[in-house]
C-alpha cells in the first residue's frame, strides 16, 4: 500500500483530492506560522546579550530576571486565552474567512507595537504588543482548525488539519534558528534583537493577503441559510457538479445534521452556551477536548519552546550560542517528524494509537534525562565539554522530540476540530483553544521558577503526567479517523470506547450501500450529461 494511501468512509471521486483544498488549508495555516514563530523565537531573543543589556537585565537579580522574562513570555499566552473566546462571536457572525482576516490584523498591530520598544521607552510597548499579538493568535487558533475541518473530506481531514500543525513547525523552525543567525552575524546592538521581532510581520502579512482570496466555509454558509452560496463554494472546492452523487450525499448529510441540531441544541449564537451548560454529552466532550491540551502542555514541550536556553543548561550545555544551536536542531527534528506525521501517520495510524505510543515513548525519555541530571548534577559540576552521560541525555532529549511531535503536538488540534457538531463547533473550539492557552500560560509563567526550585524534578514531573495521559486516552478517547463530522455523535455514544471506531464505520458503510441502492432504484443515473460514477468496489478495511 502506498505511503499516501487513504482510508475512506465511502467511495470518493479522485477530483475531491485536488490542489484547491490543500491551497486553502495552506493559506489559512499562516496563522499557525505566526504562533510557531513566536513560541520559538522569544526565549532565545531574551537570552541575547544585546537585549539583556538594553533593558537592564544585567543589573537585576536572578529572581528578578526570571520574573520579567516570565512576564514577557506569558502575557502573550494571556492575550491568546481571551482571543480564543473572542473568535467565537467573530466566527459565528462574520464567518471563518473574516475571522482569519481579523486574527491577522490584530496580530500585525501587536507586532508593530513591539517594534517601538527600546531601552528608553522600557518594556511597556513590548508587553502591550505581545498581549495584542496573543489576541490575534488566540483567535486564529480557534478559527483555523474549524475552517479546515469544515472543508475537508473525511479521508484527508487529519492530513489537512495537519497542515495547520506543519505551519506551526515551519514558523518554529525559523524562530529557533533566527537568533542563532543574528548572534553569529551581527554585533550586539538594538538591531540584533529587533530583527527577530520584525520577522513576525511576514506570516501575518501573508495571511492578510491570502485570506482575501479564501472561499468561505460551505458548512458555515449552510448554517446561516445561504444555501446557494454554500453549494457553489462546495462545488468549487470539490471540483464536482452539484448533481454528482457524491455531492448529493454530502449536501444531504449536512442538511440532516442541521435538522438534528434544530431539534436538539438549536441554531443560533446563544444555543451552544445553553447546551454546554445543560447537555451532559456536550459537557463531556468539552471536558475531553480541554483535557487533551492539559496533557499536551503537561508533556513539557512548551517549557522547552519558550525557555530552551534554560532547559539545555540544566542538561549541562555551556554557552549561549551552543544552546541556540541545540535549540535549532530541536526545531529541525520537530519539523522533519511533522512531515512524517502529516503525510503518513495521522490518517493511517489514526489519532488514538499515536497518542498512546507517543506518551509511552516520550515519558521513558524524560525519566532518563531526569535521572541523568539527578546523578551527574551538571549545574554543580560544570565541564567545558559534554560528558558521555550528557551526550546520552541529549540523545534521549531528541528521541523524546521524535515521540512527542507526531503524537501530542498536532493531534489534539485535529481531534478538537472534528469532535463537535456544526452549531457547537465554534464555541467548543474556543473552549479547547482557550484551554490550550491557559495551560500554556501556566507553563510559560512558572517554568523558570520550576527549574530553579525543582531542578531534575521538573523532568520527572512532566514524565509522570505523560504516563497518566495514557490512561486517559485508552479509557476515554475514541478514534475519530475517517468518521464524517456529522457522525461524531454516534461515535462518542458508542461503547466500549476502544471499539467505537470500527462499530460506527461499519454502520456508515451499511448506510452508504443502502443510499446508493435507493438512488439506483429511483432511476437516477446521470449527472448533467455525464454518467454517474457507480463506484462498486468495496470500501477499504480499517
Swiss-Prot record:
One of its GO terms (molecular function) is carbohydrate:proton symporter activity. It is found in: Cell membrane. It holds the Pfam family Sugar_tr. Residues 1-22, 88-97, 152-159, 215-285, 347-352, 409-456 are cytoplasmic. The chain crosses the membrane at residues 23-43, 67-87, 98-118, 131-151, 160-180, 194-214, 286-306, 326-346, 353-373, 388-408, 457-477. It is a multi-pass membrane protein. It comes from the Eukaryota. Keywords: Cell membrane, Membrane, Quinate metabolism, Transmembrane, Transmembrane helix, Transport, Ubl conjugation. Residues 44-66, 119-130, 181-193, 307-325, 374-387, 478-542 are extracellular. Its main location: membrane. Residues 519-542 are annotated as: Disordered. Gene3D superfamilies: MFS general substrate transporter like domains. GO terms for biological process: quinate metabolic process. Interacts with creB. Belongs to the major facilitator superfamily. Sugar transporter (TC 2.A.1.1) family. Integral membrane transporter that imports quinic acid to be catabolized as a carbon source. This is Probable quinate permease. It comes from Neosartorya fischeri (strain ATCC 1020 / DSM 3700 / CBS 544.65 / FGSC A1164 / JCM 1740 / NRRL 181 / WB 181). The gene is qutD.
Amino acid at each position: 500500500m502506498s505511503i499516501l494511501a487513504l482510508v475512506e468512509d465511502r467511495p470518493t471521486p479522485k477530483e475531491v483530492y485536488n490542489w484547491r483544498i490543500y491551497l486553502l488549508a495552506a493559506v489559512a495555516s499562516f496563522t499557525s506560522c505566526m504562533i510557531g514563530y513566536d513560541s520559538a523565537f522569544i526565549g532565545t531573543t531574551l537570552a541575547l546579550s544585546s537585549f539583556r543589556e538594553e533593558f537592564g537585565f544585567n543589573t537585576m537579580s536572578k529572581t528578578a530576571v526570571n520574573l520579567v522574562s516570565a512576564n514577557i513570555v506569558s502575557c502573550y499566552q494571556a492575550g491568546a486565552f481571551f482571543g480564543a473566546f473572542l473568535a467565537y462571536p467573530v466566527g459565528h457572525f462574520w464567518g471563518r474567512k473574516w475571522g482569519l482576516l481579523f486574527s491577522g490584523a490584530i496580530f500585525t498591530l501587536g507586532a508593530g507595537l513591539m517594534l517601538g520598544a527600546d531601552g528608553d521607552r522600557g518594556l511597556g510597548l513590548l508587553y502591550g504588543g505581545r498581549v495584542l499579538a496573543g489576541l490575534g493568535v488566540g483567535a486564529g487558533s480557534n478559527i483555523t482548525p474549524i475552517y479546515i475541518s469544515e472543508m475537508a473530506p473525511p479521508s484527508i481531514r487529519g492530513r489537512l488539519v495537519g497542515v495547520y500543525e506543519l505551519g506551526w513547525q515551519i514558523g518554529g523552525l525559523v524562530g529557533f534558528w533566527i537568533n542563532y543567525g543574528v548572534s553569529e552575524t551581527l554585533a550586539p546592538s538594538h538591531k540584533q534583537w529587533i530583527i527577530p521581532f520584525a520577522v513576525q510581520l511576514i506570516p501575518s502579512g501573508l495571511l492578510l493577503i491570502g485570506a482575501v482570496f479564501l472561499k468561505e466555509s460551505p458548512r458555515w454558509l449552510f448554517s446561516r441559510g445561504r444555501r446557494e452560496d454554500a453549494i457553489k463554494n462546495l462545488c468549487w472546492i470539490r471540483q464536482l457538479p452539484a448533481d454528482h452523487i457524491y455531492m448529493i450525499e454530502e449536501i444531504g448529510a449536512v442538511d440532516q445534521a442541521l435538522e438534528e441540531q434544530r431539534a436538539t441544541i438549536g441554531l443560533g449564537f446563544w444555543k451552544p452556551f445553553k447546551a454546554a451548560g445543560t447537555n451532559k454529552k456536550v459537557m463531556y466532550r468539552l471536558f475531553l477536548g480541554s483535557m487533551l491540551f492539559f496533557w499536551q502542555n503537561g508533556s513539557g514541550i512548551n517549557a522547552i519552546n519558550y525557555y530552551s536556553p534554560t532547559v539545555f543548561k540544566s542538561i549541562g550545555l555551556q554557552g549561549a550560542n551552543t544552546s541556540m544551536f541545540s535549540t535549532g536542531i530541536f526545531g529541525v527534528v520537530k519539523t522533519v517528524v511533522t512531515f512524517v506525521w502529516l503525510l503518513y501517520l495521522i490518517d493511517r495510524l489514526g489519532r488514538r494509537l499515536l497518542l498512546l505510543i507517543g506518551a509511552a515513548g516520550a515519558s521513558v525519555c524524560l525519566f532518563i534525562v531526569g535521572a541523568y541530571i539527578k546523578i551527574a548534577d551538571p549545574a554543580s559540576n560544570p565541564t567545558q565539554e559534554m560528558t558521555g552521560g550528557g551526550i546520552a541525555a541529549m540523545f534521549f532529549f531528541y528521541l523524546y522530540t521524535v515521540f512527542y511531535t507526531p503524537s501530542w503536538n498536532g493531534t489534539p488540534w485535529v481531534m478538537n476540530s472534528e469532535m463537535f457538531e456544526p452549531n457547537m463547533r465554534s464555541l467548543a473550539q474556543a473552549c479547547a483553544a482557550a484551554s490550550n492557552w491557559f495551560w500554556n500560560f501556566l507553563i510559560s509563567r512558572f517554568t523558570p521558577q520550576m527549574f530553579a526550585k525543582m531542578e531534575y524534578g521538573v523532568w520527572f514531573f512532566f514524565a509522570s503526567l505523560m504516563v497518566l495521559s495514557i490512561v486517559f486516552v485508552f479509557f476515554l478517547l475514541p478514534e475519530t479517523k475517517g468518521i464524517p463530522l456529522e457522525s461524531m455523535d454516534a461515535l462518542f455514544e458508542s461503547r466500549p470506547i476502544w471499539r467505537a471506531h470500527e462499530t460506527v464505520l461499519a454502520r456508515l458503510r451499511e448506510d452508504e450501500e443502502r443510499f446508493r441502492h435507493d438512488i439506483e432504484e429511483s432511476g437516477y443515473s446521470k449527472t448533467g450529461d455525464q454518467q454517474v460514477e457507480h463506484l462498486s468496489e468495496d470500501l477499504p478495511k480499517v
